[in-house]
Amino acid sequence: MNKRGKYTTLNLEEKMKVLSRIEAGRSLKSVMDEFGISKSTFYDIKKNKKLILDFVLKQDMPLVGAEKRKRTTGAKYGDVDDAVYMWYQQKRSAGVPVRGVELQAAAERFARCFGRTDFKASTGWLFRFRNRHAIGNRKGCGEQVLSSVSENVEPFRQKLSMIIKEEKLCLAQLYSGDETDLFWKSMPENSQASRKDICLPGKKINKERLSAFLCANADGTHKLKSIIIGKSKLPKSVKEDTSTLPVIYKPSKDVWFTRELFSEWFFQNFVPEVRHFQLNVLRFHDEDVRALLLLDSCPAHPSSESLTSEDGRIKCMFFPHNTSTLIQPMNQGVILSCKRLYRWKQLEESLVIFEESDDEQEKGDKGVSKIKIYNIKSAIFNWAKSWEEVKQITIANAWENLLYKKEPEYDFQGLEHGDYREILEKCGELETKLDDDRVWLNGDEEKGCLLKTKGGITKEVVQKGGEAEKQTAEFKLSAVRESLDYLLDFVDATPEFQRFHFTLKEMQQEIVKKQFQSKIHSRIGSFLKPRPHNIKDSFSGPSTSGSNH
């Protein structure tokens, strides 16, 4: 690149290139020479790296239009701008073309919602809005209203087949991922707990929702860590470093996937994990590393143009709208298998094996206490273990319809409704019916992303930047010690559990140490606390022991 004048301003695309050179370890002088910039401009770009990257990441197509845009400053009416752009992204993801007049009308509506009486969605505003978000004045690419869903499947198969041949992709390089809801604390209606405690009826429990994302390759040899979206940051009861958790956990107030969360996962997790798998497990040469990720068209997914690795060899492709149930591999028994396995583990932890002498009151009390103990940490680890146990053949079979037009073979041995009925009956849950079990097993089939209404978008923009929910309170050391004492008595009296004695004893000693430390700190704090003094002393004048003036 030719040298520029000293005060030449770089556009966003050029700034991104400068940042990539810095990341690659290029020297200050070589970057200055390539882009013709001064030392101060170089350091300004380096200092504003996060601002530049965040701005580009938020765009619908990161570098489309970036060659013209030079600033990352926001709009005067930021709330209106954010709301309109969120609305536009939803329409675009659904394949709905959006004209300029519709953007202006949406802006006027959101301005009224925010009480912006002086806002005008003028032609100038429209021009600036499109420029800010790199939205071209082009026709929409939505599917024709009258075309049936099935008619879209075959052209997609042909296009996919062509890409596979052109890119020379093998099954291990084809990936599919999909979102789903998980009502992690859900129990069947009419269970002991739901009849006993009015705070725990089936419908209430069902509101304990997480969103999950599963992704694997076509031969089932590479299953990526599942993403879990929860309502708040992980509680303090989950002591593990989040990087060591068996899932990727992200907080989101509405428990929905967003474009920002998905983009972050794609570039920080999917791309590097795929590279590592192909280089270290498949032993591919670096130049042979490539992958194609197939996704649904939903508001949580950015455009395919923006979901592309820097070298262009790891890409995304979207299924035609409304064809997910027909050809999306994850919906051909993979997600269902994972959920059935999860329900099994949940029952094992949540249900109580009742004694024959227990009456209905005792059964209800035990059931409620057990379900209350089942927490988000248990759900996360059980979900991760369930995903690990989904069979490779289950994933491979799920691609049969898409790739070979064959009906996939489902293997739900041990995961049918009757299998769950058996364990429920063993735990004394005789009042639940088979229909209750079916509703419970199939009750969380919704997607993990949502089309927001105008009110929902407004609410999200208003609440953006709000504080995360408070984390759960810490346990009392005295209560923990009491529980350990009780467990030690049980272990010492039960031969088959005596091997756990020293582990529990070690925990007990640590708790006692913490109790003593807590008391010492409390006493020191009391000793150091300033003593009250006479208020008159605070306003007393200087000493009069010296000479009088």
Curated annotation (Swiss-Prot):
Source superkingdom: Eukaryota
Keywords, ordered alphabetically: DNA-binding, Nucleus
Gene Ontology MF annotations: DNA binding
Compartment(s): Nucleus
Tissue specificity of this protein: Expressed in all tissues tested. Higher expression in testis and ovary.
HTH CENPB-type domain sequence ranges: 68-139
Similarity field: Belongs to the tigger transposable element derived protein family.
Name of this protein: Tigger transposable element-derived protein 7
Lineage: Eukaryota, Metazoa, Chordata, Craniata, Vertebrata
